[in-house]
Curated annotation (Swiss-Prot):
It holds the Pfam family Ribosomal_S2. GO terms for biological process: translation. This is Small ribosomal subunit protein uS2. It comes from Blochmanniella floridana. Gene3D superfamilies: Glucose-6-phosphate isomerase like protein, domain 1 (3.40.50.10490), Helix hairpin bin (1.10.287.610). Keywords: Ribonucleoprotein, Ribosomal protein. The lineage of its organism: Bacteria, Pseudomonadati, Pseudomonadota, Gammaproteobacteria, Enterobacterales. GO terms for cellular component: cytosolic small ribosomal subunit.
């Protein structure tokens, strides 16, 4: 596994936390200091904790486990989606629907509806409907695709949850906790680290930082080396 680079993290701004007035005191152990009223994250700790998280993620991937990537901030949507798709994993990148994990039976019914609509749009069924009916069904299809498209082939609950930010994705984290699903998360200085099994202290706002985390994760869980190990 490639060694994490302090230089790359500095260049991506991983060390920049939030303004000190917005901090969560529970993040104190991961803070190096203050610069211009902004908390600076201790990257030595980030490297150690990220490395530990990567070891566990690799184990899950080697065991053919399902990893659900969650990032619903506008800036992270495309990166979350592309990382999951490249690695043959799953994602939620628009809105986390309450009960997405804890009420999987209902979600499964919605996924069935999504797949039915996809089939109808391709098998000529829509051609037999009025323009108004097609418009209504297309709207439903787009809405379901945005919400569930990234998990429609997951086939059950994931084996791990990876979130690109703890504050934004707190509902997903809480649901995973209640089901005993291990949680891996980027945690900024304004966030509550409770309930996160593998804390990765770091900037969760800068797109360069998010892309760096995701590139590192994808290199570990869907590398050629990993594929060789699983065959």
């Amino acid at each position: 596994m490639k060694k994490l680079s302090m230089r790359e993290m500095l260049q991506a701004g991983v060390h920049f936390g939030h303004q000190t007035r917005y901090w969560n005191p529970k993040m104190k152990p991961f803070i190096f200091g203050i610069r211009n009223k902004i908390h600076i994250i201790n990257l030595d700790k980030t490297i150690v904790m990220f490395s530990n998280a990567l070891v566990e993620l690799k184990k899950i991937a080697l065991a053919k486990g399902k990893i659900l990537f969650v990032g619903t901030k506008r800036a992270t949507r495309e990166s979350i989606k592309s990382t999951a798709l490249i690695c043959g994993q799953f994602f939620v990148n628009y809105r986390w629907l309450g009960g997405m994990l804890t009420n999987w039976k209902t979600v499964r019914q919605s996924i069935k509806r999504l797949k039915d609509l996809e089939n109808q749009s391709q098998d000529g069924t829509f051609d037999k409907l009025t323009k108004k009916e097609v418009l209504i069904l297309n709207r439903e299809l787009i809405s379901l695709e945005n919400s569930l498209g990234g998990i429609k082939n997951m086939g059950g609950l994931p084996d791990a949850l990876f979130t690109a930010g703890a504050e934004q994705e707190h509902i997903a984290i809480k649901e995973a906790n209640s089901l005993g699903i291990p949680v891996f998360s980027i945690v900024d200085t304004n966030s509550d680290p409770d309930g996160i099994d593998f804390i990765i202290p770091g900037n969760d706002d800068a797109i360069r930082a998010i892309n760096l985390y995701l590139n590192i994760v994808s290199n570990v869980i869907c590398s050629d080396e990993l594929n060789k190990e699983t065959h």
